[in-house]
């Protein structure tokens, strides 16, 4: 089966499963799982932060970060297309009583600085207190421009705001930009990094930041139900991914470029964008449902919409991309 719906569909490789099976474990709620401790320390060092905290999901990692930065009735500034705002169930508002202030994203995924500045509320009892600016990198596959990140985080600091990065795919950004992940993490007070996407682990995200922030997030993790017992089995997969699956993300980026080039040869398809491991393309609306069914019959899973996203990952080869392109061509040729 060729699955282009997301990079969340990656499956553990036999060597990763072996690492999980051999993991030394303890009880992480008691803080004595050695493999979890090693993962947290390793990622903190790699990102240049003081401490890390292992979570079962990126949604929970992001939420704990927002709740560590903001109190009830506070506000965070975020892009309208950001995962923390649009795709995490409204958790900041529902569970954290944190008001989002969504702003329109620019085409490159950034939030214009003048809009951020204008959205910061004055100190007045009528307003929620603006406490945080949250960015995402990559966002829609796009790597945020380094100068923009520097300017946005500087603006936040000057206005007394904290900064959080949803870095679910920050290793994709690092590979694409040629910058170490520590350089991408450095401007932010906290960063959430996911291991169950392109890095290929089955479960897990790590939040990194200052020791004081992680101590607060640790309590919120418990409140949110994220405390796990013998979690070293999962942490071992993440450690394996750090050692073996980072540099190979370049292969996913190359396969995405290959996929985009193939779609561009099909008259009925309009490629909108290509960035890291994601391709966005438009298909005639009337063909989306039948094309998705056609592809599934041929062992290819997609989510066909008028504006469709295709995501490459470690379980998709260059030959698989060729099979996908041939199948799409075959569909339109039969019409």
Indicate residue ranges for each PLM-predicted region.
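Conserved PLP-enzyme active-site core in the AAT-like
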Residues: 2-293, 298-316, 324-331, 335
């Amino acid at each position: 089966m060729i699955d282009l719906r997301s990079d969340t569909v990656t499956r553990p490789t036999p060597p990763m499963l072996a690492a999980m099976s051999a993991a030394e474990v303890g009880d992480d709620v008691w803080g004595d799982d050695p493999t979890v401790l090693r993962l947290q320390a390793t990622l903190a060092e790699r990102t240049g932060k003081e401490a890390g905290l292992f979570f079962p999901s990126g949604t929970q990692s992001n939420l704990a970060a927002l709740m560590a930065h903001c109190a009830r009735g506070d506000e965070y500034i975020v892009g309208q297309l950001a995962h923390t705002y649009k795709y995490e169930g409204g958790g900041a508002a529902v569970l954290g009583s944190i008001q989002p202030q969504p702003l329109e994203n620019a085409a490159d995924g950034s939030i214009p600085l003048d809009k951020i500045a204008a959205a910061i509320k004055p100190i007045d009892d009528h307003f929620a207190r603006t406490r945080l600016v949250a960015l995402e990198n990559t966002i829609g596959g796009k790597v945020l421009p380094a100068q923009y990140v520097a300017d946005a985080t500087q603006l936040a600091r000057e206005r007394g705001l904290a900064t959080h990065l949803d870095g679910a795919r920050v290793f994709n950004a690092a590979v694409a930009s040629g910058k170490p992940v520590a350089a991408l993490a450095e401007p932010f007070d906290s960063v959430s990094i996911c291991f169950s996407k392109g890095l290929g682990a089955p479960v897990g995200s790590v939040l990194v930041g200052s020791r004081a922030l992680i101590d607060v997030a640790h309590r919120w993790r418990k409140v949110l139900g994220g405390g796990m017992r013998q979690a070293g089995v999962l942490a071992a997969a993440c450690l394996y991914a750090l050692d073996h699956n980072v540099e190979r993300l370049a292969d996913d980026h190359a396969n995405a470029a290959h996929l985009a080039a193939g779609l561009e040869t099909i008259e009925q398809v309009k490629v909108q964008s290509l960035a890291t491991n994601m391709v966005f393309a438009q298909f005639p609306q009337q063909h989306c449902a039948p094309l998705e069914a056609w592809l599934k019959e041929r062992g290819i899973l997609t989510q066909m919409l008028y504006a469709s996203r295709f995501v490459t990952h470690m379980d998709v080869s260059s030959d698989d991309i060729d099979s996908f392109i041939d199948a799409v061509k075959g569909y339109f040729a039969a019409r």
